[in-house]
């Protein structure tokens, strides 16, 4: 329906987003922090030694391939699109600017811009993915249950209740995945069309300053075929090969920026932004601004709805898809190793990416 009536669909989805933000924004926001805390509690020595599988099971993939596949499943076009755009956007406006604690487009706002950027791509989104993947892997490989979203729920319910709720849970997971993938593809095809236009200069790719329908259609077909070929080749072949290539190209791009970019400035932002983020992650993760009659309150609420709550809903919508994949490739890993590989390592990778590439853009 949205594809046939995009304007009406956009209006309805804007209304739904505003409704969720107003009535359930606090729940969406608090869920992310809860997942991070639950994962950090799982790395206590006794729990960290538990293997996701039988004690004799060993990992199917090397650490590099395992991390590459998890990182590629959890993030992609968003990091490419927003590695420069988001730090620049927050440098111009963020809650600290709205509250008057820092000044827009001034040096005192740099650390604040990065702490909000790192909040959106740090422990919280990876925690959402990781806790779903860990619970699925635990019940699938240690309790011999099917590797489905319903398994953790049916394990704690009676057989009758489990059968009843299982179908609903799986259906909700499928719907959430479709919505999450739809958002990602929307960003991806726009970026692909604009990028090809910048490289080739082909006019048919852009119409009235936006990607043309023909360009979007071609981009969707291309991405769909690439995804199909990757999936049909299997995890051990095509997906692993593409993930390794993706990781190698990511490191190559980072190396280019380290050599030719604003390395000293990026390093300064990495340290300052990371310290600011770690010292305030608790406060940033529980503060929910409500829209009242004051202009400041409305500005804070609008900013949080457009950024934080939108991101959290996006990450949570993707958790069934990404969580299943993380569980599939993590058999034989210990919980401690899993937490490091699924939340800490990718968070640091995102921090480095945004600080090195985004820092170069800010320095310019």
Each predicted region: which residue ranges?
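Membrane-embedded translocation segments of transport machinery
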Residues: 161, 165-168, 172-340, 345-364
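Hydrophobic transmembrane alpha-helices that form the core helical bundles
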Residues: 1-7, 71-91, 125-135, 143-147, ...
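N-terminal alpha-helical transmembrane segments of multi-pass membrane transport
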Residues: 1-107, 232, 255
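Membrane-water interface regions at transmembrane-helix termini and the short interhelical loops
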Residues: 4-20, 41-60, 112-120, 134-145, ...
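Hydrophobic alpha-helical membrane-embedded segments
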Residues: 33-43, 76-80, 130-142, 258, ...
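Transmembrane-helix boundary/entry motifs in multi-pass membrane transporters
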Residues: 20-25, 54-73, 104-106, 113-122, ...
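Alpha-helical transmembrane segments
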Residues: 22-36, 119-135
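Interfacial loop/helix-cap signal at membrane boundaries in integral membrane proteins
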Residues: 14-18, 91, 97-120, 280-304
């Amino acid at each position: 329906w949205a594809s046939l009536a995009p304007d009406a669909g956009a209006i309805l989805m804007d209304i739904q987003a505003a409704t969720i933000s107003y009535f359930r924004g606090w729940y969406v926001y608090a869920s992310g922090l809860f997942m991070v805390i639950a994962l950090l509690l799982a790395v206590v020595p006794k729990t960290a030694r538990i293997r996701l599988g039988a004690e004799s099971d060993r990992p199917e993939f090397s650490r590099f391939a395992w991390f590459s596949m998890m990182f590629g499943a959890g993030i992609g076009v968003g990091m490419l699109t927003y590695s420069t755009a988001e730090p620049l956007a927050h440098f111009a406006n963020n809650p600290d600017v709205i509250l008057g604690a820092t000044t827009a487009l001034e040096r005192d706002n740099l650390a604040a811009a990065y702490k909000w950027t790192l909040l959106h791509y740090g422990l919280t989104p990876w925690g959402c993915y990781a806790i779903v993947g860990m619970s699925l892997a635990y019940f699938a490989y240690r309790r011999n249950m099917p590797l489905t979203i319903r398994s953790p729920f049916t394990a704690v319910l009676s057989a009758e209740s489990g059968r009843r709720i299982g179908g609903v849970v799986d259906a909700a997971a499928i719907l959430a995945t479709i919505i999450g993938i739809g958002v990602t593809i929307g960003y991806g095809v726009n970026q692909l069309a604009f990028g090809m236009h910048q490289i080739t200069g082909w006019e048919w790719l852009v119409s009235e300053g936006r990607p043309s329908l023909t360009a979007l259609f071609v981009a969707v077909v291309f991405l769909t075929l690439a995804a199909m070929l990757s999936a049909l080749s299997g995890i051990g072949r095509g997906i692993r090969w593409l993930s390794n290539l993706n990781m190698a190209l990511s490191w190559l791009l980072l190396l280019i920026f380290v050599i030719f970019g604003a390395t000293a400035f990026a390093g300064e932002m990495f340290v300052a932004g990371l310290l600011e983020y770690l010292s305030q992650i608790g406060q940033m993760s529980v503060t929910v601004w409500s829209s009242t009659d004051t202009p400041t309150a409305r500005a804070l609420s609008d900013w949080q709805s457009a950024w934080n709550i939108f991101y959290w809903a996006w990450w949570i919508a993707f958790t069934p898809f990404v969580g299943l994949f993380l569980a599939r490739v993590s058999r034989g890993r210990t919980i401690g190793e899993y937490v490091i590989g699924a939340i800490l390592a990718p968070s640091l990778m995102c921090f480095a990416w945004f600080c090195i590439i985004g820092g170069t853009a800010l320095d310019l």
